Design a protein with these regions (language model features):
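Extended, low-hydrophobicity, polar/charged segments
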Residues: 1-152
Length: 152
């Protein structure tokens, strides 16, 4: 969602339990049966230092480690900053990973009109969802909000 809450469908919930996945507590919505807010219980540290070594080019600008998403042309509100792929956790946390488990980053990133943590899935999860012919990761789609990027 736009405020960083991850929402799961009943299908996701069923596959998660069928394959004995770990790392998420599901909180059912009272008025939307079959949908759940996800509370990620395993929090890993995003490795800010390692991300600084990644050279990136974005819209003609060269940067290391952090992308400035720019500002609204009308109100000058910042669209935030984000770190480029690959999104890495610290080496210490990488050594603690368990199979079939979800993790989230300790910090959240803002881009345009939403903010959220980075979500990681370990071995077994992608394979399970592929086997069940179910997509779990979707590209974020930005819409047209009027004259300025913020809708003003």
């Amino acid at each position: 969602s736009l405020d960083g809450v991850s929402i799961a469908s009943r299908r996701f919930y069923e596959i998660y339990h069928q394959y004995n996945m770990k790392g998420i507590e599901f909180i059912p919505f009272e008025r939307s049966e079959g949908y759940y807010a996800c509370k990620f219980v395993n929090i890993m540290k995003f490795d800010v230092e390692r991300s600084k070594s990644i050279r990136i080019e974005y819209q003609g600008k060269v940067s290391y480690g952090v992308l400035d998403n720019g500002k609204c042309a009308i109100c000058q509100r910042s669209f935030g900053h984000h770190h480029p792929f690959p999104y890495r956790m610290t080496v210490e946390d990488e050594g603690k990973l368990k199979q079939n488990t979800f993790y989230r980053s300790d910090i959240e990133f803002e881009e345009r009109n939403y903010q959220s943590p980075i979500l990681w899935a370990t071995d077994g999860i992608i394979q399970a969802f592929t086997k069940e012919k179910c997509r779990i990761f979707y590209k974020n789609v930005e819409g047209y909000f009027g004259e300025g990027d913020c809708g003003k």
